[in-house]
Amino acid sequence: MPRVKRGVTARARHKKVIDAAKGYRGRRNNVYRIAKQAVMRAGQYAYRDRRNKKRVFRALWIARINAGAREHGLSYSKFMNGLKKASIELDRKVLSDMAIHDKVAFAAIVNQVKANVA
């Protein structure tokens, strides 16, 4: 059985890591040992933040809905309670977009909610 030299394989593996570290600062983008650690850490951050993104956006939507509801004299919790009672099934993403960009439609929803809360 012939001897296998690892030069080609090692070069390919190193190149893959160095390419993934493109754009990093300092030695993180061209020294394999350091780049490997940086790429692994970047992957961990990416994995974590794909999950955190969902929480962050939900918090943003809630803040926007709260601001829009308070302009019409309702708190967020009373507004959401009224939505459930009025059986209006719009999600927070759509409601926050309406509160920012379509104030007339949002005001109409708030008026429906006020009728059900009272």
UniProtKB/Swiss-Prot annotation:
Belongs to the bacterial ribosomal protein bL20 family. This is Large ribosomal subunit protein bL20. Pfam families: Ribosomal_L20. Keywords: Ribonucleoprotein, Ribosomal protein, RNA-binding, rRNA-binding. One of its GO terms (molecular function) is rRNA binding. The keyword Kinase does not apply. Disulfide bonds: none annotated. It comes from the Bacteria. The keyword Ribosomal protein applies. Binds directly to 23S ribosomal RNA and is necessary for the in vitro assembly process of the 50S ribosomal subunit. It is not involved in the protein synthesizing functions of that subunit. One of its GO terms (biological process) is translation. GO terms for cellular component: ribonucleoprotein complex; ribosome. Signal peptide: none annotated.
